[in-house]
Regions:
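Patatin-like phospholipase
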Residues: 1-39, 47-217
Length: 217
C-alpha cells in the first residue's frame, strides 16, 4: 500500500532504533508513505524503509558480534579522527555483513517513492536534500555524510563538496516536507516529549571555531 504522504525521520544516533521499530511495523503491515525524508540516523532508516528490509536498521545499530563493532577505541579515534568506524558502517555492513537490497530500493523509487537524505553543505552552511536512486556507491556516501557528526567524524566529500551531518542545518525538516504539498505529514522524533536543545557552551563554541573556523556558522 502506497500512501500519498510525507514521513520525516529525525536522527539521534542509536536512538534511531526507536524509529526503526516504527518503520518495521509499517513494513509488516505493507504500508509505505510516498515521500521519506531522513536526517542522520534517520537517513539510514529511510533507505532501509525504501528497500523494504525489516530489521536491518536495528541489526546495524545494535551489533551483537564484537568483531563487527563500529565504535573506535582511543587509538583508532586518534588515527582516523572519527569516533565511529564509518568504513564498517557504510561499506562492510551494506556490502557484506548486513547486505543492503539496492535493487528493491531502486524499484521502490521507480514506483513512486521519493527518498531524501538531509546533509549539511559545509561551504554554504545550508541543508541539502539529496536523492540518489541509480548509483549505489554515491547513495552510501550520502548516507555517510548525513550521519557524520561534527568533531566526532570527518567531513565527507560528494562531487568535490564537503558535507557533515544533516542535523546541523535542518534536524527536523518539517518545512521542507510542507513544500512537497502532501496532504499528510508523519514525523517520528527520537527525543522525549518537551525536549529543548540547550545553548552551546562557550567552551564548545570555541572548539567548533577552532575546527571549522573557515566555514559558515
Amino acid at each position: 500500500i502506497m500512501i500519498n504522504a510525507s514521513i520525516v525521520l529525525e536522527g539521534g544516533a542509536t536512538r534511531g532504533v526507536f524509529t526503526s521499530g516504527v518503520l518495521d511495523y509499517l513494513m509488516e503491515q505493507d504500508t509505505y508513505l510516498s515521500h521519506v525524508i531522513g536526517v542522520s540516523a534517520g537517513a539510514c532508516n529511510a533507505v532501509d524503509y525504501a528497500s523494504k528490509q525489516i530489521g536491518r536498521t536495528r541489526n546495524c545499530m545494535i551489533v551483537e558480534d564484537k568483531e563487527y563493532n563500529y565504535h573506535n577505541n582511543l587509538r583508532d579515534f586518534m588515527r582516523e579522527k572519527s569516533l565511529l568506524d564509518m568504513d564498517m558502517v557504510f561499506d562492510k555492513y551494506p556490502r557484506e555483513i548486513f547486505p543492503f537490497d539496492f535493487e528493491t530500493f531502486r524499484k521502490s523509487c521507480e514506483q513512486g517513492m521519493v527518498c531524501e537524505q538531509v546533509t549539511t553543505n559545509c561551504i554554504t552552511g545550508k541543508a541539502e536534500y539529496m536523492i540518489e536512486t541509480q548509483d549505489f556507491d554515491r547513495l552510501l556516501r550520502i548516507c555517510r555524510a548525513s550521519s557524520s557528526m561534527p568533531l566526532l567524524c570527518p567531513m565527507v566529500n560528494i562531487d568535490g563538496v564537503p558535507y557533515l551531518d544533516g542535523g546541523l542545518a535542518d534536524s527536523i525538516p518539517i518545512r521542507h516536507a510542507l513544500h512537497q504539498k502532501n496532504e499528510k505529514i508523519v514525523v517520528i522524533l527520537t527525543r522525549n516529549p518537551g525536549y529543548r536543545k540547550k545553548s552551546m557552551t562557550k567552551g564548545m563554541a570555541k572548539l567548533y571555531r577552532r575546527a571549522y573556523g573557515k566555514y559558515p556558522e
